[in-house]
Amino acid sequence: MTADVNVVIDHSEYTILVVDDVVSNVLLLKVLLTNEKFKVVTANNGKDALVQAAEKQPDLILLDVMMPEMNGFEVSEKLKANPVTQNIPIIFLTALNTTSDIVKGFKVGGERFYFKAFQ
């Protein structure tokens, strides 16, 4: 007897907001997530992320930290302070890897903190 390992999971009801100022990172994540059937919304800066999160109400936000004008920590604080977006889970994807960065990520509302394996 063999097991069927080609199980397809339908993620099409879930929307993920990808936020990064590096366009190639956004495109890579968008391709990977859409291949898994997620709906993907993108933003290239913190201000757009706040607008997209409020308008689209994603199920998850993948958020870069190092962005110009408004960094990911500031975005997270604003999202968590807004009743419309405060319950959206946030995962930080970043090149930052110090203990203080990780602690700060959790303090400002991040659920997880992952280091980018890509640039």
Ranges and model annotations:
Residues 1-15, 30:
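Non-catalytic signal-transmission and effector/linker regions of two-component phosphorelay proteins
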